[in-house]
Amino acid sequence: MEAKPVAIWLFLCSVMVILMVGIGGFTRLSKAGLSITEWKPITGTLPPLSEQDWLQEKLKYEATPEYKALNYGISMEEFRAIYLIEYIHRLVARLTGLVFVLPFIYFILRRKISKKVVIKLFVALLFGALQAFAGWYMVKSGLVAKPHVSHYRLALHLLLALVIFALLSYQFFDYQIRPQQTKLKVSGNTIYYARMILVLIVIQIIFGAFVAGLNAGLIYNTFPLMDGQIVPEDLFFLQPIWLNIFENRATVQFIHRALALLILTLVVILTVKNASIKPVYIMLLSVVIQIILGVITLLLHIPIAIAIAHQVFSFILFGSSLYFLCYLRKQTTSPICTFFPS
């Protein structure tokens, strides 16, 4: 089994998933995500080719609540601009699928990947198909009376991208990290902290999607306090109380802030306790950069470029945590490191 070509392919696929996350963020922030009102997996590959085609697409958009509420009277040129943003988003998604599927078939036929790896990557393929449906499911939520996509569906869309990224990148790390003859000695607490951090990062990414979907980044644009308060007064005005966790903009932002500080604290502790393990510094640097990006995004009222960088870097932070766990599994003999199967 030749690992290098497979590893390069997995790395490319992982990068393309991150690219898709960035393009998706730009599409959302540009308010272009609802400009294409139909989902045509095959025939939708081509954009409108004639003036008549463009007119038909614009007429479909004019029937949507978003047009009537937010973009009433936009010109054809303005419509083309938002349409092409969403079109590129969908086109790159299709391209990502091809970049994964075609080499995958080739590597299987040439027997360059083991049966275990084939199964794992086939699972990634299934999640990719599910992701396509989830994307349209999300868009549909904004084509109803309220021209705003569901933040729950937005979180699902992002979470599925994270699962695909995890499956691809972890397999890439597995190929790249070579076990050393002298095994590392790590405590059970190290594994516990590493796993906890990974889980918290996933939860944090979900709440990041909630912040984005609820426009919660447009309130309390101060740091470290929330308009002069450690705990704002309007955290629990929704009933029942538990609903505030998911639908109260102030509460969602508060949780997102708190999780960021908790993750930073745990990563610092992990770094101090494992100063001799180099990958832990990648994770520390990643979490610091991510928090800085988040604070700048908040203080500057969500500038598009910084907000996209913040969204993209959440995957890099997740990847650094995943890499650390994979490194531990490869470089230690402790049975507790079998959190991820080889």
Curated annotation (Swiss-Prot):
Cofactor field: heme b
A Gene Ontology annotation in the biological process aspect, one of them, is: heme A biosynthetic process
- According to its UniProt entry, this protein's organism is Wolbachia sp. subsp. Drosophila simulans (strain wRi)
Give the EC number(s) under which this enzyme is classified. 1.17.99.9
Q: Which GO terms describe its cellular component?
A: plasma membrane
Functional note: Catalyzes the conversion of heme O to heme A by two successive hydroxylations of the methyl group at C8. The first hydroxylation forms heme I, the second hydroxylation results in an unstable dihydroxymethyl group, which spontaneously dehydrates, resulting in the formyl group of heme A.
Supply the name of the protein: Heme A synthase
UniProt keyword annotation of Transmembrane helix present: yes
How this chain assembles, per its entry, is: Interacts with CtaB.
Q: Mostly located where?
A: membrane
From the UniProt record, list the reaction(s) this protein catalyses.
Fe(II)-heme o + 2 A + H2O = Fe(II)-heme a + 2 AH2
Any Pfam family hit: COX15-CtaA
Query: Where is heme bound in this sequence?
Result: 256, 310
Localisation per UniProt entry: Cell membrane
Q: How does it sit in the bilayer?
A: Multi-pass membrane protein
Pathway it works in: Porphyrin-containing compound metabolism; heme A biosynthesis; heme A from heme O: step 1/1
The family line of this record is:
Belongs to the COX15/CtaA family. Type 2 subfamily.
Q: Where are the transmembrane segments?
A: 6-26, 88-108, 117-137, 154-174, 196-216, 252-272, 288-308, 309-329
